[in-house]
Amino acid sequence: MQMDPGPQVPLYWLGFVYAALAALGGISGYAKVGSVQSPSAGFFFSELAGLDASQPSRNPKEHLSSPVYIWDLARYYANKILTLWNIYACGFSCRCLLIVSKLGSMYGEQILSVVAMSQLGLMKN
């Protein structure tokens, strides 16, 4: 007798592709410039993107890592704006903040508590 696996949730392949591209971007940044900051940021953000893509595929109600990921990405690019005054980083950071505000209006206080907990280091695995 076969067991029923339950409802199947499709994998978020776009998130996994983005995670792979972010990691490759970090590697190519290291190869071109020789900066250690580029691969570390690439691997960090690709890890967060992979986590964000795999969570809803296991449980469709878990979408809370996406705002934390976008917030950290916006904070990273905001730091680049302050040090380099790069226009691309400014536009990308503003776009990330708009996405966070849109998700904030959809999910309300749930997102704000998760972001606050992640900033304080209170998130548990």
Curated annotation (Swiss-Prot):
Membrane topology: Multi-pass membrane protein
Keyword tRNA-binding: no
Annotated keywords: Membrane, Transmembrane, Transmembrane helix
SS bond list: none
Entry's localization field: Membrane
A cellular component annotation (GO) from this entry: mitochondrial membrane
The gene coding this protein: TMEM14EP
Major subcellular site: membrane
Pfam family, one: Tmemb_14
GO biological process: regulation of heme biosynthetic process
Record-given protein name: Transmembrane protein 14EP
Membrane spanning residue stretches: 9-29, 81-101
Assigned protein family: Belongs to the TMEM14 family.
This protein's record includes keyword Ribosomal protein: no
